[in-house]
C-alpha cells in the first residue's frame, strides 16, 4: 500500500498529516486505501496491481491494472467511456561499440512503488477562451522496473474536465543516462467500444502541400471502429471526438517538446481500438527521422482525454493546463484583430497600393493589425518603406509572411530559406523588429517529425526575444504551446475560408456550413484557430452561409489574432450596426459558455470580456432551427444581427429576456453584442 509520506500538495498549501491522508479498510483480505482521490486496491499477500484515481468530485476516474501489461480505463458516473486500453513503450539504444539494445517497457514489468499528490495550477493566458485559470487535479505516479533494468514511470492525472497520462523514463545510472535512446514504438491505444459515434478528420497523405490538418472532417459523424479509407488519408488526426452515451471524449496530446514528435491515430482500427502512431516517412519531403531520439531523463507528451458533457468539452482548457508554463516576459504580447488582403486578391501582397487600402480598413474598423502575405519581398524598397510609415501613422501593426523552408518543402512563395537556419532567422527577426514589424506568419511546415517540432519551438523562442508575435500556417495543431510561448497568437491547422478560392471536390462552399458547426467541438477546443472567417463578398458565389452565419463566426471561433479576410468594399458596405459589431469584437476572452449545439449541426456560444457578453449562433444544416436559450446571465440591451425577412443584413435591439427563443434559417446565424459599445 502507499506510504502517505509520498503524498504532497503542489499549490503551496500545508501538507496534510498522514492520519488525514489515508484511511485504510481491511476487508476480505484486501486493503482499500483512499488517498487524495486515489483508491489503491492491493492484496495483503502480494504487491498491488490495480489502482484507481478520481477527480476531486469523484465524477471522473481512471482505473489502471498491470497484471498483463499496463492498461487503463476511464469512467464517468454514467459508466465506462474508454474501455481497457494498452500502455507501454519500446525503446532502443546503442552502446559505444554500436551494439543495439532493446528495452521493452510494455510487458513483464515489476511494480516498484507509487506516489500520489494533488496538483494545483494557477496561471493567466494572453489569449484563449478563458484567460485566468485555477485548476486542481489528483495525480498517481506508478513506478515499474523492466526485465532489462530500465525503469518506467507512468503519471496519471484526473481533473474535473478530463484525464491524462504520460510516460517518464529516468535513471540514476550514469552509463545509461549517457546513452542516446530511440522511441521504437508507443503502445498507447484507446478502446472506444463504448462510443456510438466518432467525428474524425483524416490525417493527410504527405505531398508537396501536406500534411497540414486541412482535410475535410466527417462532420456528420462516422461509425466507431472504421479504419481510414486510403482515398481519405493516412490515418486520423487529433483531436478526435467520440460520443459515448450521455458523455463525450476528445482525445489529444499536450506538453509536446523537442524530445518527441507529433502523434496522430494510426489508419488501422481493430476492434474499436484507436492506436497512436508517429509521422509519415515522406513528410518534409522525406527529410528527418520518423521516430524520436532523446537522452534521459525523458518525458512523453501528455495523452489527454477531455471527458464529459459537450459544455465541458468546449469550455475546457485542459490542453493548456498540461503544457509547460511560460518562462518569458509577455507584457508586450497583445492579441487583436487584423485585415488580410490575400484571400480576396492573391497578388495583393506585392502591391503596396492595395496593402495600403487594407491598412486603412484596419484603422477605420479599430483593428490592431494588418497581414502582408506571401511575396511581399518583391515590393521595391522605397515603396515598402512608405507602407511601413503609413501603417505606423495609422497605429496599425504589420505581420509579415515567411516560408518555413528550408528543405522541408518545395513551395516557391517567398521569402524562403530564412526560417530554417537559426542564424539567418535571428538576423531577419532583428532586422524586421527594428522596422517596427509586430508579427510573422510562417507557412508550409508539412511535417510533425521531431526535427520540425524542434524548429517550431526554436522559432518561437527567437521570435519572443525580438518581441514578434507568431502565426503558424500550413502547420501542425496546437498542443498548449500558446501557454509556454505566449507570443504564439494563432495557428491554422483547419480547412479555413481560404478554401473558398481553391478548386476542390466537393467545393469548400458546400462543406463550410457543417464544418463551421463542427470545429468548435474539435479543433478550436485545443487552441487558437486561424480560419480567417467573416466573409460577405458576393463574388464568392459558392458560399451557402448567410450574413448572420458569417458574422457569428467572429464569436464562435477563437483566435488570438482574428483575421477578417474579405475585401475592403465588403466591410465598408455594411450597415453601421454591423461595423460596430466587427469593431467591438474582443480577441481574448475572460469566459466562454456553451449554450447549445451538436457537432456538425449547430452551435451557440457566449463569450465574456470584462462585464460584457457576446453571443454567436450558427446553423450548419439546410433546415431552419428554433433554439431556446437562457441568457439570464446577460444584462443590458443587446444588438442582434441576423438574417430576417429575407434581408441579408438585419439588426434590432432586444433585452436578454426577449432572446429566450431565436430562429436560425438554413445555414444561417445570429450575432449578439452589447448595444452600449456602439
What name fits each language-model region?
Residues 598-634, 667-673:
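Carbohydrate-binding surface patches
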